[in-house]
Amino acid sequence: MKVTFITGNKHKLSEAEKIFHDTGIELEHADLGYPELQGTLEEVARYGAEHAARIMDGPVIVEDAGLFIRALKWFPGPYSAYVQDTIGNRGILKLMENVEDRYAEFRSAVGFCAPKSEPEVFLGVVKGRIGTEERGTRGFAFDPLFYPEGMDRSFGELSTIEKNRFSHRSRALKKFAQWYTENYEVI
C-alpha cells in the first residue's frame, strides 16, 4: 500500500526510503507545508498528519523531531528547527560551554493518518550526549553535535545506513512500518 511522506527535508526522505525498502510499503513524497502547532512533538505530528491526510485525500505520514538537552531544561525540544535556523550548532555549543552534564536525547514522532480516520503517533528516542565541537559532515542539523550512547562518533560521522540502525527517526519509522503492515493490506 502506498503512503505519502509529507516533508520538505530531503535528508528525512532519504532515511525513510532506506528504512521502508524491504517492508512492502511504497513511499511517495509530497512537499506540502502544514501548520505546526506550538506543542509537543506528538501534538505536532498528530495535527500535521490529520491536516495532510485531508488535503492529500490519502494515507500520509509526517515526522517531527527534536534535540532535548537535559542541562538546558530539555531545550531546544520541539523548537529545534527554529533554533537550528537561528543560533545553529555554534549557538548550542555556546550555551553548553562549561556545562558538565552533556546528556541529550534525539526524539522523533511519526504521525500517520488516512482520510476519515484518527491519527496514530509512533515515538522513537535515542540517548546520547552533546560533544564539545562539531564533528562530521554527514547527516544534517544537530547531527555533528550528538554522540549516541556508547559511541565515540557523532551522528554527523555516521553513514545513513549506520545511523538508520538505531536513530530516533529510524525507531519511530520502524514502529510505524510494523503497525502499518499489521493493520493495512500491503500490496
Curated annotation (Swiss-Prot):
Cystine bridges: none
Residues that hold Mg(2+) according to the record: E36, D64
Active-site residue list: D64 (proton acceptor)
GO cellular component: cytoplasm
Cofactor info, note text: Binds 1 Mg(2+) ion per subunit.
E.C. numbers: 3.6.1.66
Organism taxonomic ancestry: Archaea, Methanobacteriati, Methanobacteriota, Methanomada group, Methanobacteria
Pfam families, sorted: Ham1p_like
Cofactor(s) this protein cannot do without: Mg(2+)
Binding site for substrate: T7, G8, N9, K10, H11, K12, A65, F140, A141, F142, D143, K163, H168, R169
CDD domains linked: HAM1
Family as reported in the entry's similarity comment: Belongs to the HAM1 NTPase family.
PANTHER family named among the record's database cross-references: INOSINE TRIPHOSPHATE PYROPHOSPHATASE (PTHR11067:SF9), INOSINE TRIPHOSPHATE PYROPHOSPHATASE/HAM1 PROTEIN (PTHR11067)
Biological role stated in the UniProt entry: Pyrophosphatase that catalyzes the hydrolysis of nucleoside triphosphates to their monophosphate derivatives, with a high preference for the non-canonical purine nucleotides XTP (xanthosine triphosphate), dITP (deoxyinosine triphosphate) and ITP. Seems to function as a house-cleaning enzyme that removes non-canonical purine nucleotides from the nucleotide pool, thus preventing their incorporation into DNA/RNA and avoiding chromosomal lesions.
Assigned keywords, A-Z: Hydrolase, Magnesium, Metal-binding, Nucleotide metabolism, Nucleotide-binding
Quaternary structure and partners: Homodimer.
Catalytic activity: XTP + H2O = XMP + diphosphate + H(+); dITP + H2O = dIMP + diphosphate + H(+); ITP + H2O = IMP + diphosphate + H(+)
Protein name: dITP/XTP pyrophosphatase
UniProt xrefs under Gene3D superfamilies: 3.90.950.10
